[in-house]
């Protein structure tokens, strides 16, 4: 996990510098505080999945940009967990720049909820429940999905994933970035 946090730190710093952004500008573009971005860059803080999504959206890079890379061992790049371990995400395939999608395996702890800020404009997400039950909330409406069921939705609005059961929830998320170059 140490290498993953080091990778996150280096990836964020490299991305910010490649864009020529100050920490202040990066904070404005991502919606993540300047202090938090600085702590992540220095390896002093581990971001939540939601924070990492905000950063990826603000920099217009796929989520998997931060959890895959040359500086990681294959086992380490396979999982990214929030500090409180309520949600774990791992890429099933590397980001496909031609097709512009991420395919992720997600696990949500028993009784947990994860709230997601809107992804970039035009982003579409498809979820397939593998095990358990998923409550997917958007604009105050919750949809219930059982194992084997799937749903496609516009991910450019705030949305939430909730596990109502006393056992872990596992689902796959295919995120299609329609406007990404």
Predicted regions and their residues:
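A short, Lys/Arg-rich alpha-helix, primarily the initiator
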Residues: 1-18
């Amino acid at each position: 996990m140490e290498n993953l946090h080091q990778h996150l730190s280096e990836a964020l710093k490299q991305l910010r510098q490649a864009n020529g952004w100050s920490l202040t500008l990066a904070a404005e573009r991502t919606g993540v505080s300047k202090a938090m971005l600085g702590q992540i860059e220095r390896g002093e803080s581990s971001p939540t999945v939601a924070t990492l999504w905000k950063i990826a959206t603000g920099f217009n890079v796929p989520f998997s940009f931060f959890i895959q890379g040359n500086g990681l061992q294959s086992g380490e790049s396979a999982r990214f967990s929030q500090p409180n371990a309520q949600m774990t995400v791992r890429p099933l395939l590397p980001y496909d720049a031609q097709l512009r999608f991420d395919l992720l395996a997600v696990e949500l702890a028993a009784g947990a909820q994860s709230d997601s800020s809107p992804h970039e404009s035009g982003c579409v997400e498809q979820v397939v429940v593998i095990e358990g039950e998923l409550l997917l909330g958007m604009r105050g409406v919750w949809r219930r999905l059982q194992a084997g069921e799937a749903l496609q939705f516009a991910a450019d609005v705030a949305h939430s994933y909730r596990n109502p059961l006393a056992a872990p929830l596992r689902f796959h998320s295919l995120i299609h970035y329609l406007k990404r170059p």
